[in-house]
């Protein structure tokens, strides 16, 4: 019988492959063993695809510098523990207790950053936005009342994150919830399935929006990839 953790792992992998984000949990045979097995996945769209809502310069720096640093640092940390580096990165964040004490903090930060960003790129698309339809749309209406109420609650969660972190729409078992996480913590660490997330670290928006986080959050609704979120919801509910 498939456990809840197994179902989450299956949903993470199948949805990423289906929507063009194959870099998560794949190995690069061209890398040396000292560098570790994890690679930076390419963006699933051109760097300027999300203009004017998220500018090309921000996307390039965010992906090529910030996300890349998480991958590089994760490989460096796990070079000290080859047995752990043999696992897909989502398994690492879901099973942090299995990581040695002296590595756990660094693995949590960098594996979390890798997982979160790989998901984040696929949670957005050119000409995105609108409202969710189908099973996810109905579930959002049932849980929150209306899409407008959901949007208000999600925006509040995102704008109220103190310092750096994320806001998420997650499945906790089969219940939809809105929550936030600090730093690069992932809902996967608590056994929850992220369906939608927004990065509210300043590097995600400061070049264009400066200190106007609320404006960035509002702009995000124009690039949401609801197809990706709906696919993850459907697969997880059936798992």
Positions of predicted regions on the chain:
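N-terminal secretory signal peptides and thylakoid transit peptides that target proteins
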Residues: 1-16
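C-terminal segment of N-terminal export signals and the immediately downstream linker at the start
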Residues: 23-54
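All-alpha RGS (Regulator of G-protein Signaling) helical domain and cognate RGS-like helical scaffolds
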Residues: 33-37, 65, 71, 76-86, ...
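Acidic/His metal-coordination segments adjacent to aromatic residues that form catalytic metal sites
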Residues: 49-53, 95-102, 182-185
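Soluble non-cytosolic domains of exported or imported proteins
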Residues: 53, 57, 61-68, 223
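Short, contiguous alpha-helical
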Residues: 60, 107-128, 195-212
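An amphipathic alpha-helical core segment
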Residues: 156-210, 218-224
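N-terminal targeting pre-sequences for secretion and organelle import
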Residues: 215-239
């Amino acid at each position: 019988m498939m456990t809840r953790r197994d179902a989450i792992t299956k949903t993470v992998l199948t949805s990423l492959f289906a929507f063009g984000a194959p870099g998560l949990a794949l190995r690069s045979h061209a890398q040396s063993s000292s560098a570790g097995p994890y690679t930076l996945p390419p963006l699933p769209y051109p760097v300027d695809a999300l203009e004017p809502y998220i500018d090309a310069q921000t996307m390039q720096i965010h992906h090529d510098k910030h996300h890349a640093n998480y991958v590089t640092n994760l490989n460096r940390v796990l070079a000290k523990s080859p047995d752990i580096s043999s696992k897909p990165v989502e398994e690492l964040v879901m099973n942090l207790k299995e990581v040695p004490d002296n590595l756990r903090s660094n693995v949590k930060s960098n594996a979390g950053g890798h997982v979160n960003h790989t998901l984040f790129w696929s949670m957005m698309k050119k000409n995105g936005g609108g409202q969710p339809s189908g099973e996810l749309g109905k579930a959002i209406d049932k849980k929150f009342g209306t899409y407008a109420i959901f949007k208000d609650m999600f925006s509040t969660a995102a704008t109220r994150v103190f310092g750096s972190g994320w806001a998420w729409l997650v499945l906790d078992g089969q219940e939809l919830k809105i929550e936030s996480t600090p730093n690069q913590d992932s809902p996967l660490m608590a056994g929850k399935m992220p369906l939608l997330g927004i990065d509210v670290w300043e590097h995600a928006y400061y070049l264009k929006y400066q200190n106007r986080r609320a404006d960035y959050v509002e702009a995000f609704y124009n690039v949401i990839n609801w197809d990706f979120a709906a696919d993850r919801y459907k697969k997880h509910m059936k798992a």
